[in-house]
Amino acid sequence: MKRADDFQQRRAHLANLSDEELQTRFWEMAEKIVDPLLDLGKKNTTPSIERSVLLRMGFSSLEAKAIVDKTMDRGLMGKGAGHIVYKIAKEKNISVREAGLALSEGKYWDDAIQIFKGGVK
């Protein structure tokens, strides 16, 4: 079975557009596709994803687990464990590693809650 060539019909609505207009249309359509995915990524996370982020930041699996557990205990999971580590490092002017280790030991959580305006109660 051979498909009928209907290319000219399918492109009719694009035929009169300039290259610049086509490029603009392409990026608008790409944003429509990607925006919901980005939104899902921003709003939904899991302990596994957060541990994975921390592993890529250089923490061991045990350190990452401790940070994620404490993040969940304080209702800050939606902020992202890696984001919390990064913000504390910036706030305290210390390395990301030092911030993460301190958080895994229970330090700086009051600061994290303050920075992120509290967690989920």
Swiss-Prot record:
Domain of life: Bacteria
Activity regulation comment: Increased activity in the presence of dithiothreitol (DTT) in vitro. Inhibited by 1 mM potassium phosphate and potassium chloride. Inhibited by L-alpha-ornithine, D,L-alpha-lysine, L-beta-lysine (50%-60%), L-alpha-lysine (26%) and by delta-amino-n-valeric acid to a lesser extent. Significant decrease in activity is observed in the presence of 0.2 mM p-chloromercuribenzoate, N-ethylmaleimide and also by 2 mM iodoacetate to a lesser extent but not inhibited by arsenite.
GO molecular function terms noted in the UniProt entry: cobalamin binding; D-ornithine 4,5-aminomutase activity
UniProt EC number: 5.4.3.5
SUPFAM superfamilies found in the cross-reference section: Cobalamin (vitamin B12)-dependent enzymes
Temperature profile: Optimum temperature is 37 degrees Celsius for native enzyme. Displays half-maximal activity at 23 degrees Celsius and 49 degrees Celsius. Rapidly inactivated at temperatures above 45 degrees Celsius. Loses more than 35% and 30% of its activity when stored at -20 degrees Celsius for 1 month and at 4 degrees Celsius for 48 hours, respectively.
Catalytic reactions of this protein: D-ornithine = (2R,4S)-2,4-diaminopentanoate
Keyword tags: Isomerase
A Pfam cross-reference name: OAM_alpha
Quaternary state and interactors: Heterotetramer of 2 alpha (OraS) and 2 beta (OraE) subunits.
Chain's role: The role of OraS remains obscure; however, it seems to be required for a correct folding of the OraE subunit. The complex is active only on D-ornithine and 2,4-diaminopentanoic acid and not active on L-ornithine, L-beta-lysine, L-alpha-lysine or D-alpha-lysine.
Protein name as catalogued: D-ornithine 4,5-aminomutase subunit alpha
Species, as recorded: Acetoanaerobium sticklandii (strain ATCC 12662 / DSM 519 / JCM 1433 / CCUG 9281 / NCIMB 10654 / HF) (Clostridium sticklandii)
